[in-house]
């Protein structure tokens, strides 16, 4: 599965801790991330990560494009709800795209843990259904 990792500045340490804790699960998937988040997670875990621009410089939109193309399966976006973000319209657009295209979205470590543990158990069949036009055939 394709997984996006995004974290606002005050949540980057949470994302790094999460990626270290779930490194073995994340290693089985293709990872994408916005600029600094991807760099810091890669440095901490050694995981290969396709890095886009920083969020405010278009990285959120680049990940959004993958969502719109049905090429993203899960988004882990650790948001800082207490700090105003200069690129808030991009953040809102990304969240809206997750809703439009039925992409699971975790905005905090607790939800991310539930999603990643279930991903590891193989309970994300609905993504195969979405990719196969409403059938559960994986051929």
From Swiss-Prot:
Substrate binds at residues 8, 12, 34-37, 54-55, 87. Residues 1-139 form the MGS-like domain. Disulfide bonds: none annotated. GO terms for biological process: methylglyoxal biosynthetic process. Its EC number is 4.2.3.3. The active site is at residue 60. GO terms for cellular component: cytosol. PROSITE patterns: METHYLGLYOXAL_SYNTH, MGS. Keywords: Lyase. It is an enzyme of class 4 (lyase). InterPro entries: Methylgl_synth, Methylglyoxal_synth_AS, MGS-like_dom, MGS-like_dom_sf. GO terms for molecular function: methylglyoxal synthase activity. It catalyses: dihydroxyacetone phosphate = methylglyoxal + phosphate. SMART domains: MGS. NCBIfam families: MGSA, PRK05234.1. HAMAP family: Methylglyoxal_synth. PANTHER family: METHYLGLYOXAL SYNTHASE. Catalyzes the formation of methylglyoxal from dihydroxyacetone phosphate. Belongs to the methylglyoxal synthase family. This is Methylglyoxal synthase. It comes from Bacillus pumilus (strain SAFR-032).
